[in-house]
């Protein structure tokens, strides 16, 4: 009976598929043991576990009460938003509630009554944990979709942000980018950030409501239109750099930059029809457990993986104590169909089960100790001792080669899972980690390498404890940043990565002072400022800001040039000539 049960458990992963089994009990020549497989949690509606934040304060309508109109009938403004009345209030929670059939509930912003000041809103969705997208993100807007919007993501619980996708009715005008569609991207560019015009152009507030972040279109590049070739998708997830991470985040943020305009320009006489209204946000995905768990549950108010393979942490991102014989690694989808678990292991165990530790070899037996394989590594772990001068009366140091020893043999060696080897330098009485990984450095791999900074939301033994600074090469002084991830910017550059400019500067392969603007550096004599870089002067004027009349051209002289038919010299020119003639006459005498 036990043999039949073991056979059933062994065959179960073969028929279940989709990486949903983490381990099975098998019988081997050495006896029964666990066999591990790469595994992942089931797909779920992530919006059921999200925390939402709407900024700035006061952007939600109803305090004070406010009336608003629709684009279809802008002069019938009988609708009202009142936060004190439950029937008329539109709080943020209505973006995630379950709606009765035929009755839409929605969050709504204030109207654009303060035009021309921008009407902008940030909607941040936080899970306090890494999650992975498996389907499109779909945002449903009532009363029209925004004409300009940015979707951003964070990998560190909202400390830093990066663009995910740009949306605009004119991508070139709004962001200086050409419009593209996800379905038209190549396999090598499937994880690139793009700007789309598909979801921003006016088509009626009731006809087109949805704005999408297209995950399925990107998957289809590898798995086919019907997503039937998932084996190819899983293979590319492992082989294509950055593809798997592209669908991973801890937070999403929608930056609503300009509301629906009804297909026209802003009409100042009726600003009560311009606002944002969102009735639903659908996010389909799963907990990111690094292929070390098939369950994800809510604990202490947050999603957490139920880790297998002797791993631990919210994302199964580190090895359990006493299972750190080798450095932690994420599981892999390859080889198909069950992948590689890359389980953490105790000393002497192939799969991570606790076994009897190996017998210690005598210190003189060099075959027990792993050998340093490269000269570069040897330099990194040894200390050179200078030769003693003949007339020295101090003391003599007898250099000895440092011993590189497996980590489990050192009680004082803690590398936080970033190395599995230590070196003991006896004449310094120092135990230090060797070959720190995951962009760490230091005696215990406790510091980040230059060009990286500490991830405050990760434990010290997390693989993602160090985040790359990613400083803009042109806008920053160097590639290093401070402990919060902010880079040191050159003059005129701003932003965490120095990839933006002060309002007094413009970007052109670096930040340069504005030549003109619409505030203080005005173009004169009817000139127009073009992208803060130059003034386009009308006929008859020249200069940096069109301040100089062009008196040198008879057919193109400005009104400040005194001229008549035949180009009569100006009075001040005649006076100068007379003075010169008088001076010449005196000298001749």
Curated annotation (Swiss-Prot):
Biological processes, Gene Ontology terms: axonogenesis; modulation of chemical synaptic transmission; postsynaptic specialization assembly; regulation of neuron migration; regulation of neuron projection arborization; regulation of neuron projection development; regulation of presynapse assembly; synaptic membrane adhesion
Entry's transmembrane regions: none
Tissue expression as described in the entry: Expression is restricted primarily to neurons of the CNS, particularly in the cerebral cortex, habenular nucleus and superior colliculus. Low levels in lung, kidney, heart and spleen.
Residue ranges occupied by any Laminin EGF-like domain in the UniProt entry: 287-346, 413-468, 469-513
Location of the Laminin N-terminal domain: 35-286
Region annotation (NGL discriminant loop I) ranges: 69-88
Glycosylation sites: 122, 128, 310, 455, 482
Membrane topology per record: Lipid-anchor; GPI-anchor
SMART domains: EGF, EGF_Lam, LamNT
Entry-linked InterPro entries: EGF-like_dom, Laminin/Netrin_ECM, Laminin_N, LE_dom, LMN_ATRN_NET-like_EGF, Sialidase_sf
Lipid linkage positions (GPI-anchor amidated glycine): 566
Gene3D superfamilies, A to Z: Galactose-binding domain-like, Laminin
Region (NGL discriminant loop II): 201-203
Biological role stated in the UniProt entry: Involved in controlling patterning and neuronal circuit formation at the laminar, cellular, subcellular and synaptic levels. Promotes neurite outgrowth of both axons and dendrites.
PANTHER family: NETRIN-G2, NETRIN/LAMININ-RELATED
Assembly and interaction partners: Interacts with LRRC4.
Protein name stated in the entry: Netrin-G2
Organism in which the protein naturally occurs: Mus musculus (Mouse)
Lineage: Eukaryota, Metazoa, Chordata, Craniata, Vertebrata
């Amino acid at each position: 009976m036990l043999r039949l049960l073991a056979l059933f458990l062994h065959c179960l992963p073969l028929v279940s598929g989709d990486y949903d089994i983490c381990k099975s009990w098998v019988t081997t020549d050495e006896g029964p043991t666990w066999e591990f497989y790469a595994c992942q949690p089931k797909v779920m509606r992530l919006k059921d576990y999200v925390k939402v934040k709407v900024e700035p304060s006061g952007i939600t309508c109803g305090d004070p009460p406010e009336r608003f109109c629709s684009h279809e009938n802008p002069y019938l403004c009988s609708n009202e938003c009142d936060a004190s009345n439950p029937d008329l209030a539109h709080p943020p929670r209505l973006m995630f509630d379950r709606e009765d059939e035929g009755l839409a509930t929605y969050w709504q912003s204030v109207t654009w009554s303060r035009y021309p000041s921008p009407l902008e809103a940030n909607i941040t969705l936080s899970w306090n944990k890494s999650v992975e997208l498996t389907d499109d993100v779909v945002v449903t807007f009532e009363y029209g979709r925004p004409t300009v919007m940015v979707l951003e993501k964070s990998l560190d619980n909202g400390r830093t942000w990066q663009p995910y996708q740009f949306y605009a009715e004119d991508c070139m005008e709004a962001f200086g980018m050409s419009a593209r569609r996800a379905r038209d991207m190549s396999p090598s560019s499937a994880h690139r950030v793009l700007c789309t015009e598909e979801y921003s152009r006016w088509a009626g507030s009731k006809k087109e409501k949805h704005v999408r972040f297209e995950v399925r279109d990107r998957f289809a590049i590898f798995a086919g239109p019907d997503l039937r070739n998932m084996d190819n998708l899983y293979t590319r997830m492992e082989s294509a750099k950055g593809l798997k991470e592209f669908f991973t985040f801890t937070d999403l943020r929608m930056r609503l930059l300009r509301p629906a305009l009804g297909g026209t320009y802003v009409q100042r006489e009726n600003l009560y029809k311009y606002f944002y209204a969102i009735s639903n946000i659908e996010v389909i995905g799963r907990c990111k457990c690094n292929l070390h768990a098939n369950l994800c549950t809510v604990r202490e108010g947050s999603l957490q993986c139920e880790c297998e393979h002797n791993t631990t942490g919210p994302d199964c991102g580190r090895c359990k104590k006493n299972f750190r014989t080798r450095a932690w690694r994420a599981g892999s989808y390859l080889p198909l169909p069950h992948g590689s678990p890359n389980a953490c292991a105790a000393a002497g165990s192939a799969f991570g089960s606790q076994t009897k530790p190996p017998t210690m070899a005598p210190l003189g037996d060099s075959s027990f100790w792993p050998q340093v394989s490269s000269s570069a590594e040897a330099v990194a772990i040894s200390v050179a001792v200078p030769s003693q001068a003949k007339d020295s009366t101090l003391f003599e140091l007898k250099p000895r080669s440092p011993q590189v020893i497996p980590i489990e043999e050192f009680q004082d060696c803690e590398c936080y899972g970033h190395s599995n080897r230590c070196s003991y330098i006896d004449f310094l009485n120092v135990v230090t980690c060797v070959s720190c990984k995951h962009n760490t450095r230091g005696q215990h791999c406790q510091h980040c390498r230059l060009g990286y900074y500490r991830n405050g939301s990760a434990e010290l033994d997390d693989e993602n404890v160090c985040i790359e600074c990613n400083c803009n090469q042109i806008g920053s002084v160097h590639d290093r940043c401070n402990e919060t991830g902010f880079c040191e910017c050159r003059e005129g550059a701003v932003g965490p990565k120095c990839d933006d400019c002060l309002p007094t500067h413009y970007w052109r392969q670096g930040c340069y002072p504005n030549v003109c603007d619409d505030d203080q550096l005005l173009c004169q004599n009817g000139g127009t400022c073009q992208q803060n870089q130059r003034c386009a002067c009308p006929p008859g004027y020249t200069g940096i800001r069109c301040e100089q009349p062009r008196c040198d051209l008879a057919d193109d002289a400005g009104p400040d040039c005194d001229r008549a038919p035949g180009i009569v010299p100006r009075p001040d020119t005649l006076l100068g000539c007379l003075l010169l003639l008088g001076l010449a006459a005196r000298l001749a005498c």
